[in-house]
């Protein structure tokens, strides 16, 4: 490891297993307002704000279950939005779904992407002038 403030490595991108990478790339590009920079049957990639997310085809892919008491959830993305209800409605219109179990008590919202993987919506922090 480097000295305090220095890093040994830099994150270049995140890759996520998927049943249908092209579909997931289209979904997240629309959800985030990013660009699909690569897409075929085995891999999809989106990019925006200097961040890349890749989606790789995994035969027999099974998404995490939500809620999952067994702890099989592998990861989740947190997306900040201006309005939870409006964002959830917009994302469901392009392929997300909203499970019944919502642990956030209105502080955040859990949705499932088109592959069934959970992700969360949380309010964008207020900025002070």
PLM-predicted stretches and their roles:
Residues 1-25, 74-81, 122-129:
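N-terminal beta-strand motif that seeds the catalytic metal site of vicinal oxygen chelate
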Residues 8-59, 86-89, 93, 99-101, ...:
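Core segments of cupin and vicinal oxygen chelate
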Residues 46-49, 111-114, 124:
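Active-site beta-strand termini and strand-to-loop segments that position acidic
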Residues 47, 52-70, 75-80, 106, ...:
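Conserved, structured core segments of small domains
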Residues 57, 101-102, 121-128:
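Short beta->alpha transition motifs characteristic of CBS
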Residues 69-72, 93-97:
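Short intrinsically disordered coil segments
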């Amino acid at each position: 490891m480097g000295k305090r403030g220095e890093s040994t490595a830099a994150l270049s991108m995140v890759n996520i297993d998927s049943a249908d990478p092209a579909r997931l790339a289209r979904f997240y590009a629309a959800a985030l307002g990013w660009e699909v920079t690569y897409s075929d049957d085995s891999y999809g990639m989106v990019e925006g704000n200097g961040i890349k997310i890749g989606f790789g085809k995994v035969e027999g892919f099974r998404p995490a279950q939500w809620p999952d008491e067994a702890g099989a959830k592998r990861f989740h993305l947190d997306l900040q939005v201006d309005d939870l209800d409006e964002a959830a409605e917009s994302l469901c219109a392009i392929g997300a779904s909203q499970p019944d179990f919502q642990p956030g008590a209105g502080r955040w919202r859990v949705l499932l992407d088109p592959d069934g993987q959970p992700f969360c919506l949380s309010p964008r922090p207020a900025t002070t002038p």
